[in-house]
């Protein structure tokens, strides 16, 4: 199922995206977000996350940097890693930069 979804996303990017133009207000683009979500979380949860993202992508959205959330197992591994450093509120802007895209 994952391969089918990735194939459909690739067909969209090659066949339809050039005609629609770059209109996504987020980074990564919605199609890249969908691909990353399916690869990170699997076809069911990845499709759900992609659908939520598509609902947030509209002309009145502020946009900006919106990465795929890490998988539950990835977050647990990072929190128990002794080499990882703790982040504070002062580090938050550096960890997630705010990118505002120009509006057409």
Curated annotation (Swiss-Prot):
GO annotations of cellular component type: plasma membrane
Alphabetic keyword roster: Cell inner membrane, Cell membrane, Membrane
Annotated Low complexity bias: 78-98
Top-rank taxon: Bacteria
Keyword Transport: no
Record's bilayer topology term: Peripheral membrane protein
Stored InterPro entries: Membr_insert_effic_factor_YidD
UniProt similarity note: Belongs to the UPF0161 family.
Function according to Swiss-Prot or TrEMBL: Could be involved in insertion of integral membrane proteins into the membrane.
Protein name: Putative membrane protein insertion efficiency factor
Organism name: Ralstonia nicotianae (strain ATCC BAA-1114 / GMI1000)
Species lineage: Bacteria, Pseudomonadati, Pseudomonadota, Betaproteobacteria, Burkholderiales
